[in-house]
Amino acid sequence: MKITVLLCNMFHVKHCYNKYLVYHNSKWDCKFFLNYKENINNESYIKEHLSSELKIPMDCINLKYVTSKIHEKYSESDKMNKIYSHKFYLADIVDFSEIMKKDVFEIDGRTYYWMSMSELESDQNVLKKNSDIINYVKESF
């Protein structure tokens, strides 16, 4: 089970609403929503990881479980069809750090981007590797 966390960007007029925080995954050479393997204490686990990765206090993070999806998809790395199970959470960050207010920023060597759904959909690499999740987020949010 994979946990997908959607961080909506709601902190500055310049960025407007409806932007999501994605990161560049060097293994896949692609931008993905933040995601974690499922843990028995999902919400605490997610908050701890978000706090650690984004350098923000845990008490500034509010999480809401939204939905789940199970689907079959071809795995490029394993060269076979696999069943994927995703849980989607919406994260609200109460107080953004100054670095997170930039359209593109880096923390601990990982590059993050605030992107709208239309920007994600116009990235052919993202669509090729992650269109199932992009479409599901678009339908669900």
What residues fall within each predicted segment?
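Active-site segment of metal-dependent pyrophosphate-handling enzymes
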Residues: 51-100
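Short, solvent-exposed loop/turn segments that connect beta-strands within catalytic domains
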Residues: 13-19, 78-81
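Functional cleft and adjacent loop/helix regions within the main domain
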Residues: 28-39, 73-79, 104-107, 140-141
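Acidic, metal-coordinating catalytic segment for phosphate/diphosphate chemistry
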Residues: 1-10
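NUDIX/MutT-family hydrolases
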Residues: 85-140
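Conserved beta-strand termini and adjacent loop/short-helix elements that scaffold enzyme active sites
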Residues: 23, 64-68, 115
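Conserved Nudix-box catalytic region and its N-terminal flanking loop in Nudix hydrolases
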Residues: 15-56
